[in-house]
Amino acid sequence: MARTKRTAYKSTGGKVPRKQLVIEAAGKSAPSTSGMTKPHRYRPGTVALREIRPYQKSTHFLIRKLPFQRLVREIAQDFKTDLKFQSAAIRTLQEASEAYLVVFLESKQHSNLARMYSQNKSFPWLEGKRRQPQPM
């Protein structure tokens, strides 16, 4: 037989399906699994943490610059009209507001995670209302 050249292909890394053993017809039957398998589910919170990680690594603003600038100008008009802002001032306001939001949401996240792990399905603002004495 003549030798021929073969091109190398990268392996896809997939597993080769195993051959099914032939079961003898002596009364033994294979368990029927009708192809129904459960979908893979991650533990609660795993997917949320995976979505958070890119935002933790990044250093850019999470709020878009122009909508934030419009909001700042709109709020400032309530106090005084015809105000002008330097771009550095708006950038500083945006950094401060995002830092505040991150701290605020982190504290809420920790309380929500603690509530999730304790399996307590109550809400703090409702508990405060329950503790108040009812007027007679």
Swiss-Prot record:
Modified residues (N6-acetyllysine): K5, K10, K15, K19, K28, K57, K80
Modified residues (N6-succinyllysine): K15, K57, K80
A Gene Ontology molecular function term of the record: protein heterodimerization activity
Modified residues (N6,N6-dimethyllysine): K5, K10, K28, K80
Residues modified as Phosphoserine: S11, S29, S32, S58, S87
Residues where N6-glutaryllysine is found: K15, K19, K28, K57, K80
Modified residues (Allysine): K5
Post-translational modification: Acetylation is generally linked to gene activation. Acetylation on Lys-19 favors methylation at Arg-18.
One GO CC term on file: nucleosome
Sequence positions bearing Phosphothreonine: T4, T7, T12, T81
Residue numbers bearing the N6-butyryllysine modification: K19
Sequence positions bearing N6,N6,N6-trimethyllysine: K5, K10, K28, K57, K80
Quaternary context: The nucleosome is a histone octamer containing two molecules each of H2A, H2B, H3 and H4 assembled in one H3-H4 heterotetramer and two H2A-H2B heterodimers. The octamer wraps approximately 147 bp of DNA.
Protein name: Histone H3.3C-like
